[in-house]
Design a protein with these regions (language model features):
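N-terminal active-site segment of His-dependent metallophosphoesterases
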Residues: 25-100, 104-105
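Extended active-site neighborhood of metal-dependent phosphoesterases/phosphodiesterases
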Residues: 28-33, 100-215, 240-245, 334-336
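Active-site-proximal beta-strand elements of phosphoester/diester hydrolases
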Residues: 44-54, 173-182, 222, 312-318
Length: 338
């Protein structure tokens, strides 16, 4: 039975937050410590997406209140952090401060025994005292962490997948890809997923397909930096149109608004996608398994839509308060797979 995905954007104002009470490259990744993900008997599975917490060892209490309140309200089966999890070069001068910054955002999940997965953004690796490998080891030390450091097999740190079993446990009914979109290219522009990561994705998808009787396993994909095709959900308008945003990179002399025939939500800054098209989107079309791909990175963008090719792309705006954002609003995105 084909799974249906319902994406729900959650946004709380500052007032609401304050008032709330407190593997090998070709193989399918296995969840850690035997904690298999599985659909409930009612056929549902809930994923919460948290983006750009981007704080220090002295995490803003408003963010922590928001995380706690959202977990209690939605009761997700899995939480995915999509990068810029700590404030990078601002997090502090000791390894212990980095560890504490990570612990601040993970303890709400530990307290509720909720599994989580994580990818990195462009700021995580800017820490002066830890590498992304160091940070991944810190995340993986938690019993409820399903993230995997794939080692030297692939570029980046933390490209893996999480199969979700059917209600009866007999097969993989759904899949989640977690992709490291790296940080900056050789020219200082935003990077993206590299070729060997794309090859890994295709090999993994083919392995899942073979186990599923030759049919692609429907999947969600999460990464920090958007693909350039996010612009397919926008339309170009003349300079000066109210609500328009300036494009990024090769589109920096153009202005855009949300194309309401394809997408809904808001875009309050030009999408800062990877500067070069690495072929990731084309690979999704070829494989036919990506039901939706969702990104963080641009803190004030909260849009979701479907391209003419039939792939759903979307943003989740920032969660943290120690960064720029949409006034006092902060966001999380919920996915109910049914």
């Amino acid at each position: 039975m084909k799974k249906k995905i319902v994406a729900i954007m959650m946004a709380l104002s500052l007032l609401a937050a304050i008032m709330t009470p407190m593997a090998s490259a070709a193989s399918v990744s296995a969840t850690k410590k035997g904690a298999a993900l599985q659909f409930h008997q009612d056929g549902k599975f809930k994923i919460m997406m948290i983006s750009d917490t981007q704080d220090t060892d002295k995490a803003d209490q408003r963010m922590l209140n928001f995380i706690n309140a959202s977990l209690d309200q939605e009761r997700p089966d899995l939480v995915v952090f999509t990068g810029d999890n700590i404030a990078g070069k601002w997090v502090g001068s000791t390894v212990e401060k980095v560890r504490t910054a990570i612990d601040k955002i993970i303890q709400p999940l530990v307290a509720r025994s909720i599994p989580f997965a994580v990818v990195f953004g462009n700021h995580d690796g800017e820490s002066k005292v830890t590498t992304k490998e160091d940070q991944m080891a810190m995340f993986m030390a938690y019993d409820n962490c399903l993230a995997i450091d794939e080692g030297e097999a692939l570029d980046g740190v933390g490209t893996y997948n999480l199969p979700i079993l059917s209600s009866d446990g007999s097969r993989v009914a759904f899949n989640v890809y977690m992709m490291d979109s790296n940080d900056y290219d050789e020219n200082g522009n935003y990077d993206g997923v590299h070729q060997n990561q794309i090859e890994w994705y295709e090999q993994t998808g083919n392995a899942l397909k073979a186990e599923n009787g030759g049919e692609p396993v429907p999947s969600l994909l999460f990464q920090h930096i958007p693909v350039p095709q996010i612009y397919h959900l926008l339309k170009e308008v003349p300079f000066g149109v109210i609500g328009s945003v300036r494009g990024y990179g090769t589109r920096s002399l153009k202005w855009y608004v949300v194309d309401e025939t394809k997408a809904e939500g808001n875009v309050k800054e030009g999408p800062c996608c990877c500067y070069k098209d690495h072929g990731q989107y084309a690979s999704w079309l070829k494989q036919g398994d990506i039901a939706g791909a969702f990104f963080g990175h641009d803190h004030t963008n909260n849009m979701v839509g479907k391209t003419d090719d039939g792939i759903t792309l979307g943003y989740n705006a920032g969660c943290g308060f120690n960064l720029y954002g949409d006034g006092l609003n902060r966001s999380m995105r919920m996915f109910v797979i049914d």
